[in-house]
Amino acid sequence: MRLVREARPHGREKLRSNLMEWFHWLLREAEIYDVRYPVKGAYVWRPYGMKIRRNVEALIRRLHDETGHEEVLFPVFIPYEFFGKESEHIRGFEKEVFWVSKGGEGGERLVLRPTSETAIMPMVKLWVQDYKDLPLRLYQIVSVFRAETKMTHPMIRLREISMFKEAHTVHVDREDAERQVREAVEIYKRIFDEMCLAYMINRRPDWDKFAGAVYTIAFDTVLPDGRALQIGTVHYLGTKFTEVFEVTYLAPDGSRRLAHTTSYGISERSIAAMLITHGDDAGTVIPPKLAPIQVVVVPIFYGEEEKGVVMPAAEQAAKALREAGFRVHVDGRDDKTPGWKFYYWELRGVPLRVEVGKRDVEGRQVVVARRDTLAKYAVAVDELVDAVKALLSEVEANLRRRAVEELRGRIVRVETVEAARAAIREGKVVELPWSGDNDCGLKLQELVGADALGVPMDSEASVGGFDLRDPACGKRAEVWLRLAERY
């Protein structure tokens, strides 16, 4: 494998200048998603987008199945008598709920699920009898509905979240449930690592935790415009839902005890984050393990005579790659120029392009181009499979490295409100000393003009032995609080 063109990646000026305009352009031109459906916050997945989505769903399913989770499918309707049982939960969701107020000639009042804790617990009560039935680990990938009143964004802020993976687990005690919380965090790290995403792990402040949770752990990434995007959450629910739904089990000593539960969710926001994080002014780069097409073969010919020489060689290269397990497409269209095809597949984020021209056939080689760097390599035909394997690994590693470096460069630690405001204006995530007092934290948000993401769980959270003061209320600081503008 010989380098024949140095790396010269596309710029990101258009992407950075107006991120949402760029994202709409990408979804439209790459035929991933159509935003023209005439219901606010409800959009259409196009065939290429569905291929990306199915690969992400397969990753999610694999990692849940491998860790003892079992897939289920619950109805979209939740009876109001179930939904209204947990008071904190209904207070948190009531303004976002779609109500089914009429069905045919009447009928009971129903809720379109915003999340499924109140749908699943009544059934768990029927399934769990004694401690031998626990732990119970369930998940489903479904649509959930939120009556968003804010501005909606494709994949990011929706009224129908159509790829909502929600896991619900039931345990004998807090210790076992919190062990599950830690495992859920590890599952999400593996998912986001395969998506080549950089992320922060934050314990949400009490005023921003999931409605009905004892505590919430969130995964946040930062988009190129400096705004944070929540891409996953894990909740320890304690006995809040099992108390109201009377989910108990028979313990070994013969007593009946309340079960403890957790839930954790991820949605198409993660796909939005992936497309944007790896995007540039020519389109996006889809991480190799998730790309519908990992290698596109572009035959380069002029006239029927060259076509007769080049096409068989292109098909032979594709055959060898498919037999090695790669997802390959040959773009043999003769009504499009090679340059047009290069643009088309770069827009769609295919990680590698194999170019086959007449001279390449004569020299028993091909040219392989990386989408992430645009570097090109001359590769002997009999070395193509090994070269593609190595280059796909390099593309994946480079995407992950770039994302991590960019996120690290955005997180700054400051001690004053003025410094925090200045950093937020520059698109940074700030860490400020915090006393842990909720009133002080809410005031910090107001003073800085940003949202609290929470206390870091991926780095040292304690202020240690430093005599730092909470800038909102003057109390002695105990931990660092992350703040950022966010979607």
Curated annotation (Swiss-Prot):
Main location: cytoplasm
Protein's cellular compartments: Cytoplasm
Xref: SMART domains: ProRS-C_1
Gene3D superfamilies, sorted: Anticodon-binding domain, Bira Bifunctional Protein, Domain 2, C-terminal domain of ProRS
GO BP annotation list: prolyl-tRNA aminoacylation
Broad EC category: ligase
Enzyme Commission code(s) on record: 6.1.1.15
Catalytic activity: tRNA(Pro) + L-proline + ATP = L-prolyl-tRNA(Pro) + AMP + diphosphate
Gene Ontology MF, one: proline-tRNA ligase activity
InterPro entries membership: aa-tRNA-synt_IIb, aa-tRNA-synth_II, aa-tRNA-synth_II/BPL/LPL, Anticodon-bd, Anticodon-bd_dom_sf, Pro-tRNA-ligase_IIa, Pro-tRNA-ligase_IIa_arc-type, Pro-tRNA_ligase_II_C
Gene Ontology CC entries for this record: aminoacyl-tRNA synthetase multienzyme complex; cytoplasm
Keywords, in A-Z order: Aminoacyl-tRNA synthetase, ATP-binding, Cytoplasm, Ligase, Nucleotide-binding, Protein biosynthesis
Quaternary organization: Homodimer.
Role played: Catalyzes the attachment of proline to tRNA(Pro) in a two-step reaction: proline is first activated by ATP to form Pro-AMP and then transferred to the acceptor end of tRNA(Pro).
This protein's domain notes: Consists of three domains: the N-terminal catalytic domain, the anticodon-binding domain and the C-terminal extension.
Family from the record: Belongs to the class-II aminoacyl-tRNA synthetase family. ProS type 3 subfamily.
Name of the featured protein: Proline--tRNA ligase
Organism whose genome encodes this protein: Pyrobaculum calidifontis (strain DSM 21063 / JCM 11548 / VA1)
